[in-house]
């Protein structure tokens, strides 16, 4: 009996738990959705003051989204409680209690969003185009954002899980680096200006160090950046060799390009994200079957990825 009880307690201790109280929300249902897995999710009937609690197994940093817009970051085994107050459709406040490392990380993530608001730093590049933000301004602001976030996270780096720090840093870097690669070109094409791909453009990504930690590779935005960066490097190499370049525009060609461009955990995670996105798009899913088999045979390291892909194909 003692052994069984100890085993039960041990298993329960490994659970990751999110609980929430929500006030002022006008919807009928409360939704918890996991960024990393479509199979980690819960829903509850709206009842102001009631604690909505959900426990799940996690092996890596996990970002849960409440009601499609409020992010909560957890390490495996963390337990965190959040009180969210709405004013109409807008979130008035989010207050965290629970595991110290998770609370610190989530407060830091809130501060990052506040920095963006203060800087008027838009998350969507199409919004920048609509507001006629000049490429020079976007690049300057992206560099400032990177510096501000690094400074902020340095203050808590010894007090929270490194993987959560890496997750937040990776998300910020993804936004900045994608801006470097895409916004000058988008702006020039929209305004019918000469090509933006001069020497200064290719220098923007010089000195970038790619991340391969669990925290960074758990961040979907960072994996999206890795995919885009693979094509950026291929184009740069082609131009340096005097060759034309056409960015891959089919699922299979993207898969081949990314598989060639990376190694190890970075390749594993980027390919997983590409395949996962294709399957979840629901279009010609049968095309994913041979690709998944090739991925499992040649590139898969994180077995959670292959298991999730198999579930998605069922």
Where do the PLM segments sit?
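Generic helix N-cap/helix-start motif at coil->alpha-helix transitions
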Residues: 265-272
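Alpha-helical repeat scaffolds
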Residues: 188-207, 247-258, 284-296
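N-proximal helix/coil linker or "cap" segments that precede and/or mark the start of modular domains
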Residues: 276, 280-314
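Extended amphipathic alpha-helical segments with heptad-repeat/coiled-coil character used for oligomerization
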Residues: 169-237
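Bacterial Sec-dependent N-terminal signal peptides
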Residues: 1-19
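Eukaryotic, compositionally biased intrinsically disordered regions
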Residues: 10, 16, 26, 30, ...
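A non-transmembrane, solvent-exposed segment enriched in polar/low-complexity residues
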Residues: 14-160
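Flexible helix-coil transition and linker loops at the boundaries of alpha-helical arrays
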Residues: 152-168, 213-215, 256-263
């Amino acid at each position: 009996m003692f052994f069984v009880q100890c085993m039960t307690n041990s298993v329960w201790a490994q659970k990751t738990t999110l609980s929430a109280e929500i006030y002022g929300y006008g919807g009928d249902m409360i939704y918890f959705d996991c960024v990393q897995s479509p199979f980690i999710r819960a829903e509850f009937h709206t009842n102001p003051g009631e604690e909505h609690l959900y426990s799940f197994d996690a092996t890596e940093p996990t970002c849960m989204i409440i009601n499609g817009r409020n992010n909560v970051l957890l390490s495996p085994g963390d337990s965190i409680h959040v009180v969210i107050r709405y004013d109409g459709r807008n979130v008035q406040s989010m207050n965290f209690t629970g595991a110290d490392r998770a609370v610190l990380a989530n407060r830091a993530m809130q501060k990052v969003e506040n920095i963006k608001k203060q800087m008027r730093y838009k998350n969507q590049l199409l919004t920048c185009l609509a507001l006629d933000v000049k490429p020079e301004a976007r690049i300057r602001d992206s560099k400032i954002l990177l510096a501000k976030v690094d400074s902020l996270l340095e203050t808590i780096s010894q007090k929270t899980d490194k993987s959560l720090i890496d997750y937040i840093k990776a998300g910020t870097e993804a936004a900045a680096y994608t801006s470097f690669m895409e916004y000058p070109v988008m702006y020039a094409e929209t305004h019918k200006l000469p090509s933006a791909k001069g020497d200064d453009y290719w220098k923007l990504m010089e000195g970038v160090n790619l991340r391969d930690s669990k925290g960074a590779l758990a961040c979907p935005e960072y994996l999206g950046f890795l995919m885009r960066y693979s094509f950026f490097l291929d184009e740069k190499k082609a131009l340096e060799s005097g060759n034309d370049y056409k960015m891959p525009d089919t699922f299979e060609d993207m898969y081949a390009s990314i598989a060639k461009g990376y190694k190890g955990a970075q390749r594993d995670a980027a390919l997983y994200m590409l395949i996962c996105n294709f399957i979840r798009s629901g279009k010609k899913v049968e095309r994913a079957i041979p690709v998944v088999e090739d991925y499992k045979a040649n590139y898969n390291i994180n077995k959670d990825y292959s298991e999730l892909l198999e579930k998605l194909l069922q």
